From Swiss-Prot:
Keywords: DNA-directed RNA polymerase, Nucleotidyltransferase, Transcription, Transferase. The RNAP catalytic core consists of 2 alpha, 1 beta, 1 beta' and 1 omega subunit. When a sigma factor is associated with the core the holoenzyme is formed, which can initiate transcription. GO terms for molecular function: DNA binding; DNA-directed RNA polymerase activity. This is DNA-directed RNA polymerase subunit omega. Promotes RNA polymerase assembly. Latches the N- and C-terminal regions of the beta' subunit thereby facilitating its interaction with the beta and alpha subunits. It catalyses: RNA(n) + a ribonucleoside 5'-triphosphate = RNA(n+1) + diphosphate. It is an enzyme of class 2 (transferase). PANTHER family: DNA-DIRECTED RNA POLYMERASE SUBUNIT OMEGA. Its EC number is 2.7.7.6.
Length: 136
C-alpha cells in the first residue's frame, strides 16, 4: 500500500475521531521505541501507525488502554520561576506601599474635609464641570 487513505483505516475503526486518537497514540508508542509490525518504507511514525491500523497488524485493545492511561496521567507541575513568584500575592503588601491603619486613614480624611469649606468644594465642582451646568 503506497498511500494510506482514511477509507482504508475506516474499515478497521469506523469512528474517525477514534481513528485519529488511536493512530496518534500508536505514533507516540512508535517514537518511544515500540516495535513496528510492517515495513517502514522510509515513512514517518504517523504514516506507519495508519498503515498498521489499515492492515490490522496492531492490537487495538492495547492501544485503547495506552490511550486511556496517557490521558488520565496528570502532568507534573512546573516549578514557578522568580518572575511568577513576584506576582503571587503574599502577606506583605504587594504594591510596596506602607500599610495604613483605619485610624490613620480616618484622621487623614477628617483633616482633608476640615481644610475644605463648602465654597471650596463648590468651586472645585464648578472647575471640574467646566463652569457649566451638569448635563443630564
Amino acid at each position: 500500500m503506497a498511500r494510506v487513505t482514511v477509507e482504508d483505516c475506516i474499515e478497521q475503526i469506523p469512528n474517525r475521531f477514534e481513528l485519529v486518537l488511536l493512530a496518534a497514540q500508536r505514533a507516540r508508542n512508535l517514537s518511544r521505541g515500540a516495535s513496528i509490525t510492517i515495513d517502514r518504507d522510509n515513512d514517518k511514525n504517523p504514516v506507519v501507525a495508519l498503515r498498521e491500523i489499515a492492515d490490522s497488524t496492531v492490537d487495538f485493545g492495547g492501544l485503547e488502554q495506552d490511550l486511556v492511561k496517557s490521558l488520565s496521567r496528570v502532568p507534573d507541575p512546573e516549578p514557578a520561576d522568580e518572575e511568577v513568584q513576584d506576582l503571587i500575592p503574599t502577606d506583605q503588601n504587594i504594591f510596596g506601599l506602607q500599610d495604613v491603619s483605619a485610624e490613620e486613614e480616618a484622621a487623614a480624611m477628617a483633616a482633608e474635609s476640615e481644610e475644605m469649606t463648602s465654597e471650596d468644594i463648590a468651586a472645585a465642582i464648578e472647575a471640574e464641570l467646566g463652569g457649566g451646568r451638569p448635563r443630564r
